[in-house]
Amino acid sequence: LLKRTTINFVNDTFRKNANWKILDIGCGYTAHKNASVIADIQDLSNFYENKNFIQITEKKLPFKDKEFDFVIASHVIEHVDDFEFFIKELERISSKGYIELPSRLGDNLVFENKNDHIWWFYFDDTANKLIVSKKNQLIDPFITVATAKLFEEIFRESLVIELAWEEKIDYKIDNQIRQENFKKISFFKLFRKYLSKKIRTIFK
């Protein structure tokens, strides 16, 4: 089962289940405060010296089957080359979790995403399925991660996909979306149009 959720709902669930063993994987320096175990490919043991931190060095995650009550994977899957194996691993080590991903728009807007992200996502609300395709850069990126975080406070549902899963993460690979089928949107062209419109407005 895969469905839309919000991080606020997840936080409320954690408050009601204080005894859960929770894994936050691939979180970098921003681990969830309720995480019992933190895991990342970077060695962040000094940063998380008072936490249970485990560095990931192998493709297969270093955890037992169903070891966790809940697993958080926030802004991780878009970076993983073999995302199908990673999803199977999430399903193996827990029976439920929270996934946060950039929307296709959110992905394209941010400078840092241009070379770091491999996959593109949208959620099919009818089939309750995550649709995955190879990333396409259709807009010249023009904002930083920090600016994107500010935008998310107001436009979160447009920039971020938040999903809760139980037992299985349903997804489908869709290779129909190809960059060559679309005309790339130039930021500078948009900016010129904006300036032109602004100038005409001023001198009306």
Q: What positions do the PLM features span?
A:
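Conserved SAM-binding loop and adjacent beta-strand
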Residues: 1-9
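Generic intrinsically disordered, low-complexity segments enriched for polar/acidic and small residues
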Residues: 6, 50, 60, 65-67, ...
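Conserved SAM-binding loop
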Residues: 9, 13-106
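S-adenosyl-L-methionine-dependent methyltransferase catalytic module, highlighting the catalytic core
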Residues: 84-92, 96-204
